[in-house]
Amino acid sequence: MTDNTRLRIAMQKSGRLSDDSRELLARCGIKINLHTQRLIAMAENMPIDILRVRDDDIPGLVMDGVVDLGIIGENVLEEELLNRRAQGEDPRYFTLRRLDFGGCRLSLATPVDEAWDGPLSLNGKRIATSYPHLLKRYLDQKGICFKSCLLNGSVEVAPRAGLADAICDLVSTGATLEANGLREVEVIYRSKACLIQRDGEMEESKQQLIDKLLTRIQGVIQARESKYIMMHAPTERLDEVIALLPGAERPTILPLAGDQQRVAMHMVSSETLFWETMEKLKALGASSILVLPIEKMME
């Protein structure tokens, strides 16, 4: 029997988002063994169950109220939303927040030896894709007629196999396209992972747990995007040093023993510190510059 007091979260069992989702939950302090083949895993320290399923099943599980939360790519979520609307349904859910992983783009690609004069080049062509609804929406907005060839995998081989004239598929680096004699010609949708919640009334204990989880996720993402910086800086150049390091708050300034001309400065910077920035700091007279990763952060 299902325990309705436990928060149920759906995540991808294996694939592009699985490892990042697992790491996110671990850094949020959820102790759970996700290295087995079990489809349902129970957290040891929180009333949370993790359902490990195919990524294209996750939006439906959330929209149908089977699970409370889902970690899913926006491309898969939007495709399912358009699919259900096309069938006359009114799917409901909440996007709690965008996450900082799973970035990709859904793009049109054509054979490298074919001319490209914009989307109109696809008028009357056959296009292979795993995302027919996203493709249709985009080309309908352009007023382009086309034929869709639905494939659930190996979309990039369709032109070479004579199944289609072009493709619409996810692209990360473009290496797979190049290996199959294709080139990316148009981005139609940009996606990242997101956390979604089912519609409807939520038990107070579950909502409190969701709020706690969101706070921790925010802290994890902020920590990833921030660095803890320590240095010695000349007192007369402090304003210039601080201007180079956008931070969440003002830095902590500490006196240096036996040195009236310099201070120790500690701060959290919200911007990645590149070598060029460190060289500029050194040129301003800063020394002993340390840049450290942050494991957890809460403002």
UniProtKB/Swiss-Prot annotation:
It holds the Pfam family HisG_C. InterPro entries: ATP-PRT_HisG_long, ATP_PRibTrfase_cat, ATP_PRibTrfase_CS, ATP_PRibTrfase_HisG, HisG_C, N-reg_PII-like_a/b, N-reg_PII/ATP_PRibTrfase_C. Its cofactor is Mg(2+). It is found in: Cytoplasm. SUPFAM superfamilies: GlnB-like, Periplasmic binding protein-like II. Its EC number is 2.4.2.17. It catalyses: 1-(5-phospho-beta-D-ribosyl)-ATP + diphosphate = 5-phospho-alpha-D-ribose 1-diphosphate + ATP. GO terms for molecular function: ATP binding; ATP phosphoribosyltransferase activity; magnesium ion binding. Pathway: Amino-acid biosynthesis; L-histidine biosynthesis; L-histidine from 5-phospho-alpha-D-ribose 1-diphosphate: step 1/9. Keywords: Amino-acid biosynthesis, ATP-binding, Cytoplasm, Glycosyltransferase, Histidine biosynthesis, Magnesium, Metal-binding, Nucleotide-binding, Transferase. GO terms for cellular component: cytoplasm. It is an enzyme of class 2 (transferase). GO terms for biological process: L-histidine biosynthetic process. Equilibrium between an active dimeric form, an inactive hexameric form and higher aggregates. Interconversion between the various forms is largely reversible and is influenced by the natural substrates and inhibitors of the enzyme. Catalyzes the condensation of ATP and 5-phosphoribose 1-diphosphate to form N'-(5'-phosphoribosyl)-ATP (PR-ATP). Has a crucial role in the pathway because the rate of histidine biosynthesis seems to be controlled primarily by regulation of HisG enzymatic activity. Belongs to the ATP phosphoribosyltransferase family. Long subfamily. HAMAP family: HisG_Long. This is ATP phosphoribosyltransferase. The gene is hisG.
